[in-house]
């Protein structure tokens, strides 16, 4: 299990634990490890936190009306750059949709538990509000406090992948317009130095460049679209992946150093393929003119059900090098292959 946990930590970019306890439902998430005498805090309707003796009391004090999904169609928030391009693409707002919502607990004058715990959310929880809330409230009430977000809270308050609108040519040159986000320009230029990046201010939720392959994936996908083929995708980490896609199968090849545990590596690659296929074909969030997300339930994110996915086959190429992340390259390769297979339509999601 040591090597399995190490591979999981590399792919999830946070400390992960794989053991019998996990299979038995004791995964070690922050909420699972909180002391029994914790107060519970949840976001309230005014931008603060409601605190109660248990989750039910805290939610009753929050005075929030449960959100729903909207019937209003999602619209890509950024316009394409002018010019003649071999490939163009506009992406939409999407929800990271991680399994375990944000939580952290803290003792008075202590350090908060990490919301990453045993689930890294592929970078989406790195800027979570929960740890600082738990710390400040524990110091205020002089009792341990568990700060926990509902699914709706995570959608409203959590950072999103920066939407882009770009055009590129076969020679590798082009323009990508992207929601202004710290670190996003360097992420794009790390794989596409000939692409000019224009950051734009748009109304919407917070964005983050720490979310899985943000920026550099979109740049490589656009370049693949311009060439009309995927070839081999190289990640900034140095891993490589290729993918072939049709309605029935997604075939993947990945090289990412010593596998450590092929079962774990394969599972992360299958998950990355699912995330990529779903992102390209089905996912979106409606954001209103005030920048508020209107799709607030799990079923409104557009995530493709696992049973509706093409079959995913993973070939792990032999490699005795240093173990590095491979699933981000797989994510990018499958997204590019899916887009090309579906006809490189200019706006995502393209539909199934």
Where on the chain are the PLM-derived regions?
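Flexible, low-hydrophobicity surface segments
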Residues: 1-77, 130, 159-160
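Glycine-rich, histidine-containing beta strand-loop boundary motifs that form or position
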Residues: 44, 52-53, 115, 149-151
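Short helix/loop capping segments that flank catalytic or ligand/cofactor-binding pockets
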Residues: 59, 122, 259-261
């Amino acid at each position: 299990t040591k090597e399995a946990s190490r591979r999981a930590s590399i792919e999830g970019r946070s400390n992960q634990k794989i053991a019998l306890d996990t299979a038995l439902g004791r995964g070690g998430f922050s909420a699972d490890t909180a002391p029994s005498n914790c107060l519970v805090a949840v976001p309230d309707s005014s931008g603060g936190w409601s605190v109660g003796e248990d989750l039910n009391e805290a939610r009753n004090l929050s005075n929030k009306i449960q959100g729903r999904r909207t019937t209003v169609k999602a619209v890509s928030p950024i316009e394409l750059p002018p010019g003649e391009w071999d490939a163009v693409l506009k992406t939409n707002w999407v929800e990271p949709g991680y399994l375990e919502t944000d939580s952290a607990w803290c003792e008075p004058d202590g350090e908060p538990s990490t919301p990453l715990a045993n689930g890294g959310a592929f970078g989406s929880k790195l800027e979570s509000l929960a740890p600082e809330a738990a710390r400040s409230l524990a110091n205020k009430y002089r009792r341990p406090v568990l700060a926990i977000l509902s699914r709706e809270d995570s959608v409203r308050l959590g950072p999103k992948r920066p939407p882009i609108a770009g055009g590129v040519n076969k020679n590798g040159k082009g323009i990508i317009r992207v929601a202004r986000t710290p670190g996003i320009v360097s992420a794009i230029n790390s794989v596409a130095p000939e692409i000019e990046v224009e950051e734009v201010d748009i109304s919407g939720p917070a964005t983050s460049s720490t979310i899985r392959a943000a920026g550099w994936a979109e740049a490589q996908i656009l370049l693949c679209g311009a060439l009309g083929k995927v070839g081999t995708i190289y990640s900034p980490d140095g891993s490589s992946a290729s993918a072939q896609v049709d309605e029935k199968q997604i075939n993947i090849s990945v090289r990412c150093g010593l596998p450590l545990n092929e079962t774990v590596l394969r599972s992360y690659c299958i998950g990355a393929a699912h995330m990529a296929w779903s992102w390209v074909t089905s996912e979106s969030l409606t954001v209103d003119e005030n920048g508020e997300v209107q799709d607030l339930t799990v079923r409104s994110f557009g995530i493709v059900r696992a049973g509706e996915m093409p079959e995913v086959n993973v070939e792990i190429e032999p490699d005795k090098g240093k173990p590095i992340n491979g699933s981000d390259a797989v994510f990018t390769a499958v997204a590019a292959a899916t887009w090309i297979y579906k006809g490189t339509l200019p706006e995502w999601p393209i539909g199934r």
